[in-house]
Amino acid sequence: MAEEIKDNEVKEEAAEVTEAKVEETLAMKKLTALKEFADAHEIGGLQYLQINEENLLINTRLLVEGQTLPLFIVVNNSVYTYLQAHLVTLTEEKKAATLSYLNELNNEFNMLKYSINPQGNVVLIFSIPAGDDKFDPALVFALVDQLKAHLDTHYSALMEKIWSK
């Protein structure tokens, strides 16, 4: 009888663990909402990727000044969603000279942040905060359009600064 009770307890614990795993994460809910919005509005060219359990992303491209730039929409379990555009890869010599101009851009456009990642890529990041129940995929895609408009205006000046040094 004691073994029977123990077996039932183990089965109940296993059932609880399974239920917890089935519960959809906030990141997955955000990604699903973005995919449904993109499908409903016939937005193509999107690749859905899972980096790990916490970070999911949409990989796409932006055409700016004749260049095809990688754009990632990163969702996770935090209140933030990130737009990350990878603009150019710098050599070691170009990094120091470019940082000053990137700081100027950061001061001019507070909602955007230019940085250089460890691989030497100049990355433009746009953070979009939204509470769990306030996530709006339409806003995310509208901000992708704003990011593209910003790059259409400022990308050539950035590239001139980089290649002139």
Describe the predicted segments one by one.
Residues 111-141, 145:
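Well-ordered alpha/beta subsegment
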Residues 28, 92, 96, 134-141:
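Ordered, soluble secondary-structure elements with a strong preference for glycine-centered loop motifs
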Residues 82-123:
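Short, internal acidic amphipathic alpha-helical interface segments
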Residues 48-55, 77, 115-120:
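Short, ordered beta-strand-loop transition motifs
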Residues 62-88:
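Long, continuous compositionally biased terminal/linker segments
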Residues 159-165:
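Short, highly charged C-terminal tails/helix-capping segments
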Residues 1-70:
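Charge-rich, low-complexity N-terminal segments
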